[in-house]
């Protein structure tokens, strides 16, 4: 049986819009969990306006939330090292002053350091530019911002999705602008010198037509060394697989056909996969699915929450605790006219057997 055991409030402030953990990233070390998110000013939208309820004229903070007890309680941190470069907007939202200019990365980072973190950030959702920051002490201090190359593309709109291959070797999944300059399609890139130089590896997805997009990847490496990458499309999530270390990709299936939200793909301790995402059509909320065959088939949808006030929610990121429970972080609302908050659902993924759905 799958049980959403309880929900925890991480960050909720009157008059604030807190959102988009999927853009920033999540990391865990046993029961210590760190997740990034953005906090701007709340702005009520008129009926029929399909825009986020954030004030696009006032600056937003880029924050971290840290839990030392498996997601039961949280402390909010505002690291100065994550301030955006001067004059930068993030997805159209101004940022706080005080950040450093973007520089070239000197390289030399040890990605196998157990306390290492890297977070990727963008300016514009279509063409970027993008940057990254590195921490060697679980997010207490940061180095950067460092420049993300264009890799021959018209733009890069980076979020945080990466796989550590070795001490100086990191594979990163990014969203590139399409040939028409709009978002986007997923690409794979790699550094083998600790972040100093980068090379283009592959396109993960075909290029969508017109204003359609394939963005916001979430990736895992299986015990077989194959890589699975879940990708957000307009209203659904598709899954791709590589068996040659990200050089070529094959379409696997569509695990979530109705989302309007990015995926968070997680490999569980027992080898299964967990996919979490927000649902932006009624009933609004947070959902999950499980797979025990490397993503070929998936369970029926698991309802973690169905009490959302409107579509403006989701962007999940999930980790598994040592006791096997899953901690799913997301942004949420209980009414279109109320602030957006960061919340957590702690849930039990149950036994290995589950009902399967078609690809």
Where are these predicted regions, by residue range?
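Asp-box/BNR beta-propeller blade signature and adjacent active/binding-site loops
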Residues: 1-359
């Amino acid at each position: 049986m799958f049980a959403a055991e309880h929900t925890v409030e991480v960050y909720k402030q009157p008059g604030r819009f807190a959102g988009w953990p999927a853009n920033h990233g999540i990391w865990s070390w046993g029961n210590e969990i760190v997740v990034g998110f953005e906090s701007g000013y709340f702005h009520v939208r008129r009926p029929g306006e399909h825009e986020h309820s954030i004030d696009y004229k006032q600056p937003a903070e880029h924050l971290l939330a840290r839990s030392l007890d498996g997601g039961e309680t949280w402390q909010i941190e505002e690291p100065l090292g994550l301030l955006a470069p001067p004059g930068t907007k993030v997805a159209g939202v101004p940022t706080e002053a005080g950040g450093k200019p973007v520089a070239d990365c000197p390289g030399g980072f040890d990605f196998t350091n157990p306390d290492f973190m890297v977070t990727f950030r963008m300016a514009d959702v279509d063409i970027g530019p993008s940057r990254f920051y590195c921490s060697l002490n679980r997010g207490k201090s940061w180095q950067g911002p460092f420049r993300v190359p264009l890799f021959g593309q018209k733009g890069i709109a980076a979020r945080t999705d990466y796989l550590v291959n070795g001490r100086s070797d990191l594979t990163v999944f990014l969203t590139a602008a399409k040939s028409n300059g709009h978002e986007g399609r997923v690409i794979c890139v790699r550094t083998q010198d600790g972040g100093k130089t980068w090379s283009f590896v592959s396109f993960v997805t075909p290029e969508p037509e017109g204003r359609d997009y394939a963005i916001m990847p979430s990736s895992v490496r299986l015990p077989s060394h194959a890589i699975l990458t879940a990708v957000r499309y307009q209203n659904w999530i598709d899954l791709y697989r590589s068996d040659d270390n990200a050089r070529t990709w094959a379409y696997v299936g569509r695990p979530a056909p109705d989302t309007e939200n990015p995926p968070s793909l997680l490999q569980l301790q027992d080898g299964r996969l967990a996919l979490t995402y927000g649902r932006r059509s009624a009933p609004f909320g947070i959902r999950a699915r499980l797979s025990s065959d490397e993503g070929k088939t998936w369970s029926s949808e698991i309802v973690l929450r169905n009490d959302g006030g409107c579509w403006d929610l989701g962007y999940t990121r999930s980790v598994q605790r040592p006791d096997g429970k899953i901690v799913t972080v997301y942004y949420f609302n209980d009414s279109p006219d109320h602030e957006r908050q960061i919340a957590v659902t702690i849930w039990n993924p149950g036994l290995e057997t589950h009902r399967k759905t078609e690809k």
